[in-house]
């Protein structure tokens, strides 16, 4: 193992391992800022068609470097190797722009762990994509992810200032973060009964019939009443866009399932994708959908304990676990139950990470 600044060991990461995508880099950046451990990542996004750093990943690197005063090499578009050596995290007011439709929500999620464990509040503005494929949409962040983070202690106020769809981008989100010294441990095993399901067709600068067809298809699959569906039209975006969002409210949790409109894909297919995912979640007894399950791993590891149930565990999540283990003395125990997977943290030091 190489030696990094401040006498700390340089963690070396193979970016081609597991699912080999951008989450490996984002998790490493988050944990490097929190723990102070430097890292080098090689073969960045090796399993993607366009490997190396894209604009979204580069923005996350530069944002993390600014917040933590890091020394960085390899921070350029297309780079497949990066070294990141953080100094001290400085909370405050920050503004970052992806410059494309690359995900603003993923950039924000990269920065959150360090800022929610800082010694002062922060205000972060990120411009880019707010509703695009292969990333959590703003609604998921605000209604599904943020409430769980707040139950761990930090205060997190999220505002959607402007929509950003692929390919125009131009969206804007603001996060107001009040940190805590240490995160509370959570046991997210039982979601309770399903109380309600709603479908929202989001439409920007596109014909209404698209939304009508999506809602009709979703209603047929999920058995939704007319009062449980609505069209949300917006002109507050730089370009056209469409998404169908299914909101599943349970006694203790809300999940959002989203599918995005795309040229060449029928409105019916878009609706089917979101509705089937929602139906699979409802049919399980899991607290978390597979996407939330991946995003719970890091905060639970930082809290030093906790567990949750998920619809299923993915290669994405298993890869994330391996990266977390490089920075923290933890491991996760995964067991299959009747119609869900149970994930629990095990660690040699259950004290957790504090500021």
Swiss-Prot record:
UniProt-annotated binding residues for ATP: 109, 291-295
A GO molecular function held by the record: ATP binding
Subcellular location per the Swiss-Prot or TrEMBL entry: Cytoplasm
Record GO cellular component, one term: cytoplasm
Active site: residue positions: 316
SUPFAM superfamilies given in the database record: EPT/RTPC-like, RNA 3'-terminal phosphate cyclase, RPTC, insert domain
Keyword Metal-binding found: no
Assigned keywords, A-Z: ATP-binding, Cytoplasm, Ligase, Nucleotide-binding
EC number: 6.5.1.4
Major localisation: cytoplasm
Catalyzed reactions: a 3'-end 3'-phospho-ribonucleotide-RNA + ATP = a 3'-end 2',3'-cyclophospho-ribonucleotide-RNA + AMP + diphosphate
Role summary: Catalyzes the conversion of 3'-phosphate to a 2',3'-cyclic phosphodiester at the end of RNA. The mechanism of action of the enzyme occurs in 3 steps: (A) adenylation of the enzyme by ATP; (B) transfer of adenylate to an RNA-N3'P to produce RNA-N3'PP5'A; (C) and attack of the adjacent 2'-hydroxyl on the 3'-phosphorus in the diester linkage to produce the cyclic end product. The biological role of this enzyme is unknown but it is likely to function in some aspects of cellular RNA processing.
PANTHER family assigned: RNA 3' TERMINAL PHOSPHATE CYCLASE (PTHR11096), RNA 3'-TERMINAL PHOSPHATE CYCLASE (PTHR11096:SF0)
Protein name, as recorded: RNA 3'-terminal phosphate cyclase
Organism: Koribacter versatilis (strain Ellin345)
